[in-house]
Amino acid sequence: MSELSYLEKLMDGVEVEWLPLSKVFNLRNGYTPSKTKKEFWANGDIPWFRMDDIRENGRILGNSLQKISSCAVKGGKLFPENSILISTSATIGEHALITVPHLANQRFTCLALKESYADCFDIKFLFYYCFSLAEWCRKNTTMSSFASVDMDGFKKFLIP
């Protein structure tokens, strides 16, 4: 039995409240600090995730292949630990649970559980439920120079 059908089976016959993704999570897009500014990349200690991290090290990650320095962080705000990165452009739907404060490139949208829901959800359940979100993302893409997810629909995706 696949992980997804097991999760769906667990909810069979159970009353649950379904909430839109944007109500449960703070959503932020990733970005790539300028490669021309050497100080952004020299002696960095902040994990900066790319698709290669998932491909090479799996879906639950506590370290990245590349690091950036604190001066590369826009507004001084990192994505929080125990948040989920999901690819919303190019390689649609790939996702990972990140267990440390971090940043990621622009292909990812970060899903950070809102504090008001911290006691309501288990982040690992949400991570596994993101396999359903990933499937939805692959079916709801727009094409321009590269594939990207319908972000209006993405924000409305329902979470049990």
Regions found by a protein language model. Name each.
Residues 4-31, 57:
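Non-catalytic DNA-recognition/assembly elements of restriction-modification systems
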Residues 1-3, 103:
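Short acidic (Asp/Glu) and glycine-rich catalytic loops that position anionic groups and cofactors
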